[in-house]
């Protein structure tokens, strides 16, 4: 199926309605909210690195509510076990047999809060479900609901009590980004909204349904990407592998995720084709976290995002 202007226009109306509903609930940059929706439509997952208290839980809960999806939150701690996330078999006395009791990962939107406070084995259990979209327990396989989207948060690695995520696991996230502090006007609006209600947390309006979200996820699959832009994507990824600051550049899997993100970005921009501007807008959040700096570059404080910026400046942009 080819994507038509009408398809994109209809999707654009749905996306605008979702963003408006989120903006009425969450004090956050619209670009950030679009990035979260990009993850949902691309069937990817998002890693937010931020300090506590910046609204990560509210954003995740509001996204689930607005999209008509189920939501669960897992607080990662040093004593959290893999079964606490995925579920386990418990004995049913009435039936006289063991039955699988699903864990909190069985939801459409899962907030994995402070994922780097849990030990590596528990981190791996979640990341495996992200990749496979299913849970295997005692030889039985249980499919996760569709759509399935993980929004994981982590504290900056310099904070105490954290276990840094291995590079191979970070690579499984479509996007890594941050919320950051709101500006002065935003923080004032936060207090104004709090003063106007008797509950601590606001509730977002439901705009779509799970079935509608699944339909939206299919639209980017037919967005056109010209041959010159395919070569541009590959050239950008390969250029990261040749940078002197990097021990490891973007993997082939990362290049595929890059491609998928550009198509969703085109849909969010109301187009049925990808442009170089789409590529540039998603390059930082999709590629930077996939780089592994050399020890010297890490000591010098090289910013991975600046490496991506340099690559974008150096690689010729195709004319399409």
Regions found by a protein language model. Name each.
Residues 40-78, 82, 91:
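Walker A/P-loop
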Residues 50, 113-114, 125:
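Walker B catalytic acidic pair
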Residues 51, 85, 153:
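P-loop (Walker A) phosphate-binding loop of NTP-binding proteins
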């Amino acid at each position: 199926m080819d994507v038509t202007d009408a398809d994109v226009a209809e999707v654009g109306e749905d996306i605008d309605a979702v963003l408006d509903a989120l903006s009425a609930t969450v004090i956050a940059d619209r670009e950030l909210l679009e990035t979260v929706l990009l993850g949902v439509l691309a069937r990817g997952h998002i890693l937010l690195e931020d300090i506590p208290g910046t609204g990560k839980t509210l954003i995740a809960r509001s996204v689930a509510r607005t999209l008509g999806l189920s939501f669960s939150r897992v607080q990662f701690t040093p004593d959290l076990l893999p079964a606490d996330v995925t579920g386990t078999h418990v004995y049913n006395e009435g039936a006289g047999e063991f039955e699988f009791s699903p864990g909190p990962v069985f939801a459409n939107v899962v907030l994995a809060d402070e994922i780097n406070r849990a030990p590596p084995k528990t981190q791996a259990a979640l990341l495996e479900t992200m990749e496979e979209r299913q849970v295997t327990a005692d030889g039985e396989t249980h499919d996760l609901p569709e759509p399935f989207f993980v929004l994981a948060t982590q504290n900056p690695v310099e904070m105490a009590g954290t276990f840094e995520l291995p590079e191979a696991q970070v690579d499984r996230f479509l996007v890594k980004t941050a919320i950051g502090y709101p500006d002065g006007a935003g923080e004032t609006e936060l207090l104004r909204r709090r003063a106007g209600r008797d509950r601590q947390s606001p509730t977002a309006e439901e705009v779509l349904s799970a079935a509608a979200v699944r339909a939206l996820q299919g639209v980017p699959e037919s967005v056109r990407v010209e041959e010159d832009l395919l070569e541009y994507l590959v050239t950008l990824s390969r250029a990261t592998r040749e940078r002197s600051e990097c021990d490891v550049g973007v993997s082939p899997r990362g290049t595929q995720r890059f491609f998928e993100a550009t198509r969703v970005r085109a849909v969010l921009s109301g187009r049925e084709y990808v442009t170089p501007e789409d590529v540039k807008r998603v390059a930082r959040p999709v590629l930077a976290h996939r780089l592994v700096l050399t020890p010297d570059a890490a000591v010098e404080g090289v910013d991975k995002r600046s490496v991506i910026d340099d690559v974008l400046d150096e690689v010729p942009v195709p004319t399409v």
